[in-house]
Amino acid sequence: MSKYDSHLKCSFCGKSQEQVRKLIAGPGVYICDECVELCNEILDEELFDSNATGAQPPIPRPAPAPQKRGTGTKRLSISQIPKPREIKNYLDAHVIGQEEGKKVLSVAVYNHYKRLSFLEAKKSGKSSQDEVELQKSNILLIGPTGCGKTLLAQTLADLLDVPFAVADATTLTEAGYVGEDVENILLRLLQVADLEVDEAQRGIIYIDEIDKIARKSENPSITRDVSGEGVQQALLKMLEGTVANVPPQGGRKHPYQDCIQIDTSNILFICGGAFVGLEKIVDQRIGKKSMGFIHQSGDSYQVKEKKVVDLMKQMEPNDLVKFGLIPELIGRIPMVAVVEPLDEETLMAILTKPQNALVKQYQKLLRMDNVKLEFEEDAVRAIAKEAFRRKTGARALRGIVEELMLDVMYELPSRKDVSRCTITKEMVEKRSTAELLLHPSSLPKPESA
């Protein structure tokens, strides 16, 4: 049997792989070495002709300045690495609440920097080869939707000077099936690092929706679970540390395709997920039903909001196994942080306090139209109350404010007589019109006697 695939042909000359020395694969096309040489000859002839006729060569464009990531902490000494308290203070300025999650991330990122500094010192001979090896500790963030898991990761990206990429686990499938290979996660990191492999190998990857790849049942199935357990198995070596082959164009790997090799040993992985139903598994294990954690009605039962966090803090690795994660994957994510659901007070703070708070964003937008926007405290509380009722966390806030501001944002740019717009509680609850204050010059003048 021939070692070549006779069905593969050059898209330009039509020769099969057996008839040429090299067949280069691209996204849906192939080109042989003979066609590449022909292209080079054509380009050389055109260059010779242009020089012979005295044509001016094209003016070289200056190379774009490299974009700087983070705060310039790349390859710092241990004394210059941002301390966990400094990292948390930065997170506090942009994310409200979630103290435990911030502390876990701050310590993990600080240790990641120290580990990179140690490895660089060891590589340069400044550290003893007999010293203790420092291993990375990947992180798992567990919390309901809209509580700030992804925002925490994205805020870290603004602070750090290592490449940072966010990936969605729901798009991944086992190799050989329709969907994305797990290596495409590394491709995103490589693209952020401007295709510099050394930089990418120092980066951090946040894998969102990790709970969506849980296997369908606790016991292994005889059928293929290509988007669940199969993906978990494919992630094992990547999380632990391996040399992965990444296709530079993305998509599925091809046997004749040139790939970029990336060592994942020094890449920090942060995984996040809602893990809906995990609290019920924990409750069944610790036997707290008689203490009022769960209200049971027939075959279905509902966990009280204020007790969910207490249950989740008692979670053990075996609970994650029952949820659908394989033990090998859990062992490679040793650090677990529970991100709390948001209450009304926290939602109010999210609306007004962060540097990029939603209220501040709309105030900035209307200021560009020379209008001062104000939110009454009762209006902010009413918005937070409605967002809490929708049970989608902070994501509901933007939807509610967008609904409130639609008519205002539509009318005000065309009006020059308005100086101030006030959002009231009645506007939030009854969808009434906003209170507008007109410029004194636009008010009707009193009639003279």
UniProtKB/Swiss-Prot annotation:
Residues 51-76 are annotated as: Disordered. InterPro entries: AAA+_ATPase, ATP-dep_Clp_protease_ClpX, ATPase_AAA_core, Clp_ATPase_C, Clp_protease_ATP-bd_su_ClpX, ClpX_bact, P-loop_NTPase, Znf_CppX_C4. PROSITE patterns: CLPX_ZB (PS51902). SMART domains: AAA, ClpB_D2-small, zf-C4_ClpX. ATP binds at P144, T145, G146, C147, G148, K149, T150, L151. Keywords: ATP-binding, Chaperone, Metal-binding, Nucleotide-binding, Zinc. One of its GO terms (molecular function) is ATP hydrolysis activity. HAMAP family: ClpX. NCBIfam families: clpX, PRK05342.1. Zn(2+) binds at C10, C13, C32, C35. ATP-dependent specificity component of the Clp protease. It directs the protease to specific substrates. Can perform chaperone functions in the absence of ClpP. Residues 1-51 form the ClpX-type ZB domain. Transmembrane segments: none annotated. This is ATP-dependent Clp protease ATP-binding subunit ClpX. It comes from Trichodesmium erythraeum (strain IMS101).
